[in-house]
Amino acid sequence: MKKDLLTENEVIDAVVKYFNTKGRTEVKKVVYRADASQKEHGVDLQIKLANAKGNGNKYFIEAKGNKRADGTAMRSTFNTNFRWAISQIILRIKVDSTKNNYIYGIAIPDSEIERAKNLIRDNWALKTLKIRLYGARHTENGDLEAIEYLPSDIYN
C-alpha cells in the first residue's frame, strides 16, 4: 500500500465523512471537531449517532496525521504519535463506556493501520475498552474516505 500523507485535519475530515454515511440513524451530529492548526486541547472529534428519540452512541475520537497542519514532515515517528494518541484517548475515558453507549477510537492514516494493529493487537486493556481504529485515506479521485476497524478486526 502506498503511504498516504495526511494532516490531522484531513484525517478528521475523512472520519466525519465516514460517520455522515454510517448506518441508518436519523441524527448524525458532530458535537465537537478540533482544528489541529489551532492547537486546540481535548478530544479531536465527538460525534453523536441517534434515533429519533435521541437514543444512540457517542463517539470520542483522537486523530493523528502523518504530516503537520502546515504540510511539512512530522518530527516524531508514527509509533511515538500513535502511543501519544492512545494515552490521550485513555485519559479522556471518564465513564464505563458499556453503560453509557460511549465508543472510543483513534483515527490515523490508513497506510499506518497495520503498524497500529501490530502495536495494540495483544493489549488486554485496549481490547477490554474496545478501542476502535479509523483509517483515513485518499480515494483514486482524490476524495477523503475512512474505514472503521472494529475490535474484532484488531485484537487477538
What positions do the PLM features span?
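Short N-terminal signal/transit or membrane-insertion segments
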Residues: 21-29, 67, 150-155
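Acidic-basic catalytic patches of nuclease active cores, encompassing PD-(D/E)XK
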Residues: 1-41, 48-54, 99
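Short, solvent-exposed polar/charged micro-motifs at secondary-structure junctions
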Residues: 37-46, 142-150
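Catalytic cores of nucleic-acid endonucleases
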Residues: 63-125
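Active-site ExK catalytic segment of metal-dependent nucleases
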Residues: 44-48, 55-74
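Domain-level recognition of nuclease-like catalytic cores that cleave nucleotide substrates
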Residues: 102-156
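Hydrophobic beta-strand residues in large extracellular and virion-surface proteins
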Residues: 15, 27-30, 45-47, 61, ...
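Generic structural motif
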Residues: 50-52, 92, 111, 138
